[in-house]
Amino acid sequence: MGKTQQSGCAVSVLFFPSGDEEQDRRTLGGLHRQGREIQVIPVEPGEDPSGRAKAYNRALKQAAGRFVSVAGGGDRIPSGYYRRMLKKIHKLAGSRPVPVWMPHRQFLSFSLLQTPIFEEKSCRRDTIVSLDLNCRTWPVFLSGVLLDTATARRYPMTSALGWEAEKDMLLRLLLDNRLVGFVPTLTYGYAQPQDIHFDWFAGMFDPDWYIPSVRNFLLPLLKESQSRFGEIPLFLQCFCIYYIRCRLEANSNNRNKHVLDDGQVLAYRDALHEALAFLSDAAILNLPDVAICQSAPNVHQMLMQLKRNDWSMMYQPYLFKTLLLGTGETVAYSKDSMRVRMEFIDYRDGKWEIDGSVPALFSLDDVRLYVCRNDEEFDLTYNQRYSLTKYFGVSAFKRYTFHVSIPLLEDEVQQDIQFRLQAGGMTYPLSPEYSSHFSRLSGKLRFQYWRFGRFIAYHAGNRITIRRSRWWYTAYREIRSWGELLCSRSMLEKRVLLLRMLYFITRPWYRRRRIWLFYDKIYKGGDSSEYLFRYAKKQTDGIHKYYLLDPSCPDWKRMKREGYHPLRRHSIRHRMIFLNADMVIASNSTVFPFNGYSMGLSAYIRGIPDFHVVCVQHGMSVQKIAVAQNRLRDNTRLYFCASRYEIENLSHPVYDYQGYDALKLTGVPRYDGLVNEDKKQILISPTWRMQAARLVTKSESVQRDYNPLFKQTSYFKVYNSLINDERLIAAAKKYGYTIAYVLHPIISPQAEDFDTNEYVRIIPSTGDMSYEQMFRESSLMVTDFSGVQFDFAYMRKPLVYLHHHDIPQHYEEGTFHYDTMAFGEICHTNDELIDLLCGYMRDGCRMKEEYRRRADDFFAFRDRNNCQRIYDIMLDYQKEKIDPVRHHR
């Protein structure tokens, strides 16, 4: 790329390539078409984070325009963008020195975050913002921004700050020049991920983005501002909350990148405590109402606890016309904003059974929560069901979870269910919310309802109203719901209208059919649900059974060849089967997303499905997995296990299965297909790592996207080195073994990243790959924490574990302890593993007696009758629990 320079140019654009030649060529071509007043300066930043700052400083010296801007490969720049920006600058600024001009900016990749970064949504007119008066609108990164060139040269980037060099430069400039021109009438599309884009931003995997960033960037900036101005300007305080939020969100719950070990997490917490001490309570609680700084109330409370280094701090109730919660002299939260989350509602034996939760913002010693049926009070029974939010793998806060049973009166015309909070002698109503697929109701449509037994229920302001069900009243509410959908401009709601209409047209036919819906991964079959489906399909019981698959996957054609007819995903028939199913049998959690329903979409049909979820497991439930396998994750009614250690683990209160008779010791369906057909093959099959895979960006029912950051992970480096190790390959050749490296389904999109050789097969576990065949034909398995180890141990074949020192682990031991229960030796380096594998191959790959005894102790069964045991229990459950109430749906 050559440098383009125009005499008398108005804007110098520093172009940073993305590395994607097609994107770079497209963006660069667009820049050259912007007009003669544009000078384009190509920049070569290198791969190191500090290289971008150095390249920026070098390029800035070449800038000949009055303004300088930054563009990146893949950016979408409107035609005439810079010319139009210059016109608006001339019109708005006049003679005022406004050094920074910012358009409305959109991130071009799909993102879980839709909120613009420091842009006031309500501001739709071009304006000049004073940061002393408005802390909501200003730039924290350069893409599409125009800077006064002379001003920019006074604030070069500090390359030693790496990821933070750009923010440091902008913040220092804005601290001295607090006017920002905001032009929301122009939109700039940027492709370079920012800190808040936790699915793409590369800095998340760099330890320097954490503790060194606070110590070298944030704290010096805060201390300097305090010294210069006597206080921290509010816009800088808001930036600090945004800065902290980015790092918390990037490492919350399953997003934990495992970059920091336990000691570093404590050190990071201490560093954040120092930074928060500079901030006011109002800024921490986001009282300025900056959208990008807004988090759940518990998050702001946690930051207050961190600031004060007091983890027992709770909000105190202040009693006025409404209940307020706060700390000290700062009001943080209003009762009017509090909601009681309905996580599951059911009707059993004449009672409404409600599982719910409320945010743990206050001490239960200070308030009383209860529910009323009309004016009769019922106390909540609090439990220990999983409700934690974790950051960096450490519990940060929870919700108060509860269960309550409310008898319904058969002779009452109307019964109102209302949650109430009592504090200081005053009583306040609390509104329900329905942020669960299984909450039966939602506030999406005014006339939405749930019909059950002889009753109909619907949301009514701050309460739920239950009335005796009459066919005409049900029809009235349904038709009014159709009217709401028909009047909507949303195409989604138009499709929902057709779906609901089709359901009611076909319901008389479907209600006569008992339906079981089976699925595994949708984009791949061959797991426990398929095995159970095959067995159940052969039984004569009057139940209609369907196995859900995507027609694009090879297993679709395989099952068709074998005489089965899978249910086509997203077909009209699939939609109707899902809404009318009696049971959904799943080997993977999150039933609604796997069937194409996001939380927003399921809100339109919550009152229709009434299926009972059956878990037949993808892996063994012996680790701490309450976040994914607690009872209310999928409203699981039956949970089939292969080991007493699973039952012991799942019986802990955090899973909330006690008292529901859901846990059954039967074996796992897919074990019925495990027959030894040893073909002298070494199978390497590790599980995935959260930090090595892209987060879900579409749905759990489709394969995850390629992760461009994968090759930077220790996971890739360790296994790429292992499969290309000369000693391992030489030993396999010597003793007549082949090697197969099977990628986990979530890692399979990265198959092309691995270096190949002639002797090791790299096999994505998608397409027509069969796990069962791999298990049958392999002589020995190398794994880490993967659930496939149990399939191999079930066959009493030898295993070796690689718990590598360099790969962060996300396994938390429950009732399976590797030091005393593992089915093979545990290695911590590649060299140690290869030494052991050479010995096993030399001796014929036989399972040692010690590990055989462990397998005998772990598994309750060793036969191939698992499907039969499970089917018998399911059939009894259908007859006893489902059939008696089917006619009430």
Regions of interest found by a model, annotated:
Residues 3-7, 26-38:
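Short, acidic, metal-binding catalytic loop of nucleotide-sugar glycosyltransferases
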Residues 76, 80-118:
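Conserved donor NDP-sugar-binding/catalytic core segment of glycosyltransferases
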Residues 128-216, 223-224, 228-231:
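Conserved nucleotide-sugar donor-binding catalytic segment
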Residues 231, 525-537, 669-753, 827, ...:
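Conserved catalytic-core segment of nucleotide-activated headgroup transferases in glycan assembly
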